[in-house]
């Protein structure tokens, strides 16, 4: 029995060792499988190609041809690769002349492969999947960098960009002030957009103070705005070069009031604001006064032009043109008073009576006939005196000017009493009379006028061919429309009361209506009438007594 138990125990021990060996072998196999799987995964990750469109040479060539760009890569300075769905930056090695690269609205996860773009000025990478700022050292001439709407947590690797002036990094995940310490090493940045991030530490102002050229700052959408007391005034005072904060510009008035607030509190700010308001009102009033002065000068110029068109204008003296307007006014007033007194004295002394005026005018007209052989001297003297009188009347008023012109017409000149000077200018027009010797007389011939007495006496004769009498002056025939033959015979009988037949009466009525085309002289007609009178012995005596006038003068 003992031997059997020993054999069984030995057998159980052998089985246990076998199971342990099998377990260890299985564990080693499982570890080997895990290592092989991880290695295969690494290899597969390295060998997997990015999905989606890629930036290839063929694509860039077709893109340049489509957008009418240069087919030679280095000649292009701008590439528009936005809204294409690219996941990485590649294939830009030959485009060494690029100055502006648009890669917005793609699926780019990393900034890379930009070593050959040393001339790049603007890089637009907003609305992508970028997590870190890296590989920007070759872009030494970069001026504008837009990485908005990404997943950036730390601002880094931009201190090497010495020409960077605009950084737009809004809508990211910036939170801690230490993550933005890189900004203090970028003195060239003048436009900084940090809006809509997770910034809440007021110590950000200390970093912004170290940026000497910062002019435009946007912190909207951050909690730090609520944690800084008097946010706008504080930033305006501490950032000396700031000209635009958030959504509003910083005017000089705002800066002056903020500095007064920092120095004297609310009272100092109120005083400074009142001073600025009074200054602004003064400027507005000065501008209104200037506009009023311009309008008055324009109105005065218009009135002067209208007066000059009418012939009444006050000419400024040539000597006083260089003087100021106040001096001109002060000089004109005494001149007007002196001219008034002189003109009144001259009019009272030199105004002659109407008889003397007629006598002077007649004598002047007689003397002008005698002085015709010397026309040049009189013309020159009259022209000189005209200029003198015009220059004397330049500064006078319209009333004085009329009096002066009247004295010129009425008073003869002192140099030559024989010549009457007429000055052309505003005022009444004077008509000069011509001497009787120069008047040309036309003698009209006395033509005989034909009257009624010159015409011969005509007797009433019975004649069927009575011709109308024509004279030199055209006479219009009197035409009457007769309705029937009876009325025609009655009308003829009333004109010719002697007895005659109906045929003769009809012929006579037709002759009265018809117009004769023959031209017979008065003598021929008189002989015809005498022959008719001799032949008509059978005319009754009663008809001879009643004679009618056949010829009448018509107006």
Swiss-Prot record:
Family affiliation: Belongs to the DNAAF1 family.
Matching PANTHER family: LEUCINE-RICH REPEAT-CONTAINING PROTEIN 46 (PTHR45973:SF9), PROTEIN PHOSPHATASE 1 REGULATORY SUBUNIT SDS22-RELATED (PTHR45973)
Biased composition (Basic and acidic residues): 299-312
Polar residues compositional bias, start-end: 1-12, 344-364
Bias kind Acidic residues: ranges: 330-343
Top-rank lineage group of the source organism: Eukaryota
Subcellular location: Cell projection, Cilium
PROSITE patterns named among the record's database cross-references: LRR (PS51450)
Key words, A-Z: Cell projection, Cilium, Leucine-rich repeat, Repeat
One Gene Ontology CC term in the entry: axoneme
Chain intervals for the UniProt region annotation (Disordered): 1-27, 299-401
Mutant phenotype after disruption: Development of pronephric cysts followed by death during early larval stages, at approximately 8 dpf, as a result of severe edema that is likely to be a consequence of pronephric disease progression. Fishes develop pronephric cysts with an increased proliferative index, severely reduced brush border, and disorganized pronephric cilia manifesting impaired localized fluid flow consistent with ciliary dysfunction. Electron microscopy analysis reveal ultrastructural irregularities of the dynein arms and misalignments of the outer-doublet microtubules on the ciliary axonemes.
GO MF, one annotated term: dynein complex binding
Gene: dnaaf1
The keyword Repeat belongs to this UniProt entry's keyword annotation: yes
GO biological process entries: axoneme assembly; cell migration involved in heart jogging; cilium assembly; convergent extension involved in gastrulation; determination of heart left/right asymmetry; determination of left/right symmetry; embryonic heart tube morphogenesis; gastrulation
Name of this protein: Dynein axonemal assembly factor 1
Organ and tissue specificity: Specifically expressed in all ciliated tissues.
